[in-house]
């Protein structure tokens, strides 16, 4: 008998999910980018136990239309593109249609969402990729998604995660970079019930720098402005007395 077999759909989904979602920070990135693509002006990110037990993202974006809900957790289902030609003019952060299905395959999910075109919102609860609850609810326009028990059904992947403290470092780095690149969005970051920072969402980069790094650091920043017919550069660079032994605090955002 031959040795090559066709894998079942459940195994395929879990393997594929590991390529997209490799740690809690990946979940945070994908969910925040979904909120940004939904034109949210306010995003709240909450994590517990390094994101292993809970990752919650709340936004006031356009929400998910009720008729789109059945496709939300299907692989390669997306509202961002319709054909290969759209890749040449894509303006969204997400487009592959893999993030939500990948997250659902390796975690428990609670989702509440309402679009401005629907009278009622929808609540969905999922366990290991399967919907166990779905009902209509009254809620605000936008989306609330809670990802719980990440990798509970893939012990090998869970084993290779670092300590809660280390995973939290990756998450914090992700949230900070997204906040710095999206100064027009108010972003609140909560860790284990404590607010770490909240940006004003007023479009002022220096205000975001102050929220994340503190007023002392903000006062040591110098503005950088340059533009020509091809590009424009806007940002801040620190004075010499504020220096680090590595390049981790050098952050670039292209077409942000």
Question: Locations of the language-model features?
Answer:
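N-terminal phosphate-binding caps/lids of nucleotide- and nucleic-acid-binding domains
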Residues: 1-256
């Amino acid at each position: 008998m031959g040795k090559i077999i066709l894998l079942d759909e459940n195994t395929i989904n879990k393997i594929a999910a590991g390529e997209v979602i490799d740690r809690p920070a990946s979940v945070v990135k994908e969910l925040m980018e979904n909120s940004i693509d939904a034109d949210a002006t306010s995003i709240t990110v909450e994590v517990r136990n390094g994101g292993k037990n809970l990752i919650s993202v709340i936004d006031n974006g356009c929400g998910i239309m009720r008729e789109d809900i059945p496709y939300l957790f299907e692989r390669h289902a997306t509202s961002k593109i319709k054909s290969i030609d759209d890749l040449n003019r894509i303006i969204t952060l997400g487009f592959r249609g893999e993030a939500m299905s990948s997250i659902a395959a390796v975690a428990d999910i609670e989702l509440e969402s309402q679009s401005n075109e629907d009278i009622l919102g929808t609540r969905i609860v999922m366990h290991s990729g399967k919907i166990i609850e779905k009902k209509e609810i009254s809620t605000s326009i936008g989306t609330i998604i809670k990802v719980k028990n990440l990798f509970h059904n893939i012990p090998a992947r869970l084993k290779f995660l670092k300590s809660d403290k280390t995973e939290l470092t990756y998450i914090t780095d992700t949230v900070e970079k997204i906040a710095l690149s999206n100064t027009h969005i108010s972003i609140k970051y909560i860790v284990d019930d404590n607010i770490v920072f909240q940006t004003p969402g007023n479009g002022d980069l220096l205000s975001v720098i102050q929220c994340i790094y503190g007023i002392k650091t903000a006062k040591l920043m110098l503005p950088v402005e340059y533009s020509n017919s091809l590009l424009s550069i806007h940002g801040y660079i620190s004075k010499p007395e504020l220096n680090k032994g590595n390049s981790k605090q050098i952050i670039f955002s292209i077409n942000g």
